[in-house]
Amino acid sequence: FEENGTWQGAGLLSERSKIRVRVVSRNANDRFDKAFWARRVEWAWQHRVTTMGTLALPGCEPDTTCCRVIFSEADGFPGLVVDRYEQVLVAQVGTVGMGRLRPLIYPLLLQTLRADGQDVRAVYERNDSPSRAKEGLPLEKGWWDAAGAPDSARLVVRENGLSFDLDLENSQK
């Protein structure tokens, strides 16, 4: 709310960050429940498919097997970036709010992409950015849920016909 009582929006609180609130919605009727986040995930994915066409659908475009799925504030997920490499989603969480929502959002991501015919099997977290300390978050990396995860954190991905050896654990996110 503004000082005069005008509604401005609702967001995720971070008591340790210099950015105390990250706005998620300016709609006073929104509730940050599972249905809300499911709509956000679906919107972000459909936005990728609409704007990128088959490039957003690894496997449909033989020259590209990776894409960005969630781009933080641009998609309404403050502090969350998710990229797809082959059958793995690689997530980086940079805010307390998104950290708390991981158990809700990751399954929604897998469910949404699978419902669209995408072969995604696991989520690998790269939460090792030093900026997490400003939020009071620990540095960590690894499989979010090992069920469905490949035996190795190394993949070969293609982008525009070029192949790249990708080390999910140690390469730059």
Model-derived segments and spans:
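Short, well-ordered alpha-helical segments
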Residues: 35, 39, 99, 103-107
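Short histidine-centered catalytic/ligand-binding loop motif
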Residues: 23-31, 90-102
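Short, glycine-/Ser/Thr-/acidic-enriched flexible segments
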Residues: 4-7, 96, 171
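Residue-level recognition of conserved beta-strand edge/terminus positions
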Residues: 1-2, 92, 126
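Non-catalytic accessory regions of SAM-dependent methyltransferases
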Residues: 1-86
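Non-catalytic substrate-recognition/targeting regions of SAM-dependent transferases
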Residues: 72-77, 81-83, 102-172
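Hydrophobic residues embedded in beta-strands of well-ordered beta-sheets
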Residues: 7, 89, 163-164
